Design a protein with these regions (language model features):
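Short, small-residue-biased leader/transition segments that mark boundaries at the very start
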Residues: 3-4
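Canonical Radical SAM [4Fe-4S] cluster-binding loop centered on the CxxxCxxC motif
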Residues: 11-55, 128
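Short microdomains enriched in Cys/His and/or Lys/Arg
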Residues: 51-66
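Conserved AdoMet/S-adenosylmethionine-binding subsite of the radical SAM
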Residues: 62-77, 83-229
Length: 230
């Protein structure tokens, strides 16, 4: 019950949102368009430290979360977010990705002993949700890139075929030289970058939305979707 509710959100049967008990629950900044803005303004934070005081070690809890994924018959897509996935320390992120990889291996091996029509869905896509390529592009350091490369190499061998960083550039003004450098590094590590854009009337009137799409496409970033929040 509580273990899954706090760390795992489900909106679609084949997708799971994983929110770790780490600094990944926090954000690198506060976005005006955030779906949780109403909660933030009411002082209900996603990272309420009193509420999040651990009742068991994170390693033990992480094992339980992976068991939940392993026993799920439909799961194909895990989105690690928060907060912000890249707010977690490299060591924490490495451990999470290692746990995801081992879970995918166990699930695949278990399917070898299941009859046709009774096999569980296997993991196909892993996503990291982060706005740090915008806010703090220097977070994309050599150690992080090695973690991403290593995970992709191992996970590709067990059927995972999509590796994505989902970020949130809102205007071409945010695509700084530092952000461009971070984008190139992530792409060179073999991960795809997608951008989620919240439609903003003021920015659109000034042509920022159209220009942002052109700039990101030119850098190899896929404009994943544009959404409108009320």
């Amino acid at each position: 019950g509580d273990v899954y509710k706090r760390q795992i959100h489900r909106r679609y049967p084949d997708v799971a949102i994983l929110i770790p008990d780490s600094m990944g629950r926090a954000c690198g900044g506060l976005c005006a368009s955030c779906q949780r803005m109403y909660d933030f303004q009411s002082e209900r934070l996603n990272f309420n430290f009193e509420e999040l005081k651990p009742k068991e070690s994170w390693d033990k809890r992480l094992r339980k979360l992976m068991e939940y994924f392993e026993n799920d018959t439909q799961l194909r897509d895990i989105l690690i977010t928060g907060g912000d996935a890249l707010m977690s320390q490299n060591k924490t992120l490495r451990n999470i990705l290692k746990a995801v990889y081992k879970m995918a291996v166990r699930k695949r091996n278990a399917n070898l002993h299941r009859a046709e029509g009774e096999k569980y869905a296997e993991l196909q896509r892993v996503r990291l949700g982060s706005r740090l390529p915008v806010y703090l592009p220097m977070r994309i350091n050599d150690e992080l890139l090695e973690i991403l490369r290593e995970f992709k190499e191992k996970a590709s061998a067990v059927g995972v075929s999509q590796f994505l960083i989902q970020t949130h550039f809102q205007t071409p003004l945010e695509v700084t030289p530092e952000a461009r450098k971070a984008i190139r590094k992530i792409l060179a590590a073999g991960w795809t970058i997608t951008n989620q854009l919240v439609y903003n009337v003021a920015a659109s009137r000034r042509g920022h939305t159209a220009k942002l799409r052109k700039v990101l496409n030119g850098l190899g970033v896929l404009c994943y979707y544009t959404c409108l929040l009320y």
